[in-house]
Amino acid sequence: FKVENNFLYKELINKKQGLISIAFHNRSVDMLITWINCQTPTVSLYKKIKNKYLNSFVKNKRQRNKSLSVETSISGVRKIYKALKDNKVIAFAADQVPQRGMGEYIKFYNRDAYSTTLVQSLAKKTMAPVVYLYMKSNKNNFLSICIKACSNDIYDDSKHKLLINHDIEKMINERPIDYSWEYKRFKKSQAGILDPYKTV
C-alpha cells in the first residue's frame, strides 16, 4: 500500500516535541497501529478484550518496537499524558466509545454519540501537534494510509469540542464502505433514547 503525507508524520516525529496520533475505525486499526509502531515507538490506548488469550495476543502485537499499550482508564490516561509531556508519540482511536464519566454527547452524523474529549484535552494542555491517520481503499480495493494535520481549532476552547467528530465524518465520507459501521458508535444512548442497535 502507499502512504500519503508520510513526510509530514516523519517531520513531526523528528521534532521530538510530543505528537498526538489519532486513528478511527476505518479498515483495520490494528494494521494501522502496526505501521505506526514501525515508524516510531508509541504509547497507545486500547480497550481490554474479554478473552484473555486474544487480549494478550493483541496487546503483545501493539507493543512491538518498544511501544507500550495501556488500558482506557484513568490510569491509562495519566500514562499517555505523561508520555506526551516527555515528548513521546501517543496513539489511539478517537471514535472509541469511552467509559461512562469519561466523555460527552457530541453530534456524529447529526445524532448524539457518547464521545471522547481526550484529544481536545491533551492538545490544549500540552500544545502538542495532532495528526489523523487512517486506512482507505480505492475502487480497486488498493489500500493506502492517509495522514492529515488537524486544524489549529483543536487548541481553541470555543471550537475544539465539535472538531474531532466533524473531521472524522469528513474522512469517512471519502469512502463510507471502509468504515467499520458494525462498531456500535451509538451504543451508549442518552436516557430516554431508544438503542438503535436493538432491532438490527
Where are these regions (language model features)?
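A short, well-structured juxtamembrane/interface segment
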Residues: 1-19, 27
